Design a protein with these regions (language model features):
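The beta1-alpha1 cofactor-binding region of Rossmann-like NAD(H)/NADP(H)-dependent oxidoreductases
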Residues: 54, 75-88, 119, 231-232
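Alpha-helical segment proximal to the catalytic Tyr-Lys
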Residues: 142-143, 184-188, 246
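A conserved structural motif in NAD(P)-dependent oxidoreductases
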Residues: 222-233, 244
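Residue(s) in the substrate-gating loop at a strand-loop-helix junction
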Residues: 155
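Short C-terminal tail/terminal secondary-structure segment
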Residues: 8-9, 111, 160, 238, ...
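Active-site helix of classical SDR
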Residues: 137, 171, 179
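Substrate-binding pocket helix/loop in short-chain dehydrogenase/reductase
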Residues: 112-114, 118-126, 218
């Protein structure tokens, strides 16, 4: 895509996550890659889950390992519950622990009419975007300790809806409610759960979802007049994963360039 999404190459870490390990779904590109890079710069070992974008995943791996930490690449389909359990186990086996789970992977399809959404598309969108988060979170929690963190990528569309992403928006609403609920359930164990709700962000999903006019106008309706970059969305994931976010749980952090200004 042109221009390429901006990644946080100039960020200077301060060991906020030193000694921790993280599993990030959709970590091969976009927000997931930016989060992986920041976590590495803050001292965490990182496991990357992705479908089949092996070249992209290798780019992320190289960037992570350049920071002197480990990176584990874990390809496969997160629609499969057994694969999700395997992701968690392989992360624990490789790093000895799992402190941070970032449920980030998602798919979306432009459909202007409800009748155009097939049953198969609806089911797949929920399986990738939401069911995987249930599978992964359920598998991860037994390995997590007090102070550990679960972070899910929601969306501005969970709050305002979107007439061309009806099924996608519904999954993001489900993620928001699920995150708030598990935050309440896991508080007694000292495990925090939060979400980040991006607005328009310049990732590979955009040119694969929109036509040329849609890509050109993407993000122009925000107060900032442009889409956000992955590097601009990734910082809240560091806060929520670190001890500096120790009093934050059950919350959604909105990063949307002013596209949504209501509570």
């Amino acid at each position: 895509m042109n221009p390429l999404p901006a990644q946080p190459t100039e960020y200077k870490g301060s060991e906020k996550l030193k000694g921790k390990s993280a599993l990030i779904t959709g970590g091969d590109s976009g927000i997931g890659r930016a989060v992986a890079m920041l976590y590495a710069k803050e001292g965490a070992n990182v496991a990357i889950s992705y479908l089949d974008e092996h070249d992209d995943a290798e780019v992320t791996k190289k960037a992570v390992e350049a920071e002197g930490v480990k990176c584990l690449l874990l390809p496969g389909d997160i629609k499969d519950a057994a694969h999700c359990r395997d992701l968690v186990q392989k992360t624990v086996d490789e790093f000895g622990k799992l402190n941070i789970l970032v449920n980030n992977a998602a798919i979306q399809f432009v459909r202007e009419d409800l009748e155009d959404i097939s049953d198969e598309q609806f089911e797949e969108t929920f399986q990738v975007n939401f069911f995987s988060q249930f599978y992964l979170t359920k598998a991860a929690v037994p390995h997590m300790q007090e102070g550990d963190s679960i972070i899910s990528t929601s969306s501005i569309n969970a709050y305002r809806g979107n007439p061309i992403f009806m099924d996608y928006s519904a999954t993001k609403g489900a993620i928001t409610a699920f995150t708030r609920s598990i935050a309440q359930s896991l508080a007694k164990r000292g495990i925090r759960a939060n979400s980040v709700a991006p607005g328009p962000v310049w990732t590979p999903l955009i040119p694969s979802s929109f036509d040329e006019d849609g890509v050109e106008g993407f993000g122009q309706d925000t107060l900032m007049g442009r889409p956000g970059q992955p590097s601009e969305h990734a910082m809240p994931y560091v806060l929520l994963a670190s001890d500096e976010g120790s009093y934050i749980t059950g919350q959604a952090i909105h990063v949307n360039g002013g596209a949504w200004t209501s509570s």
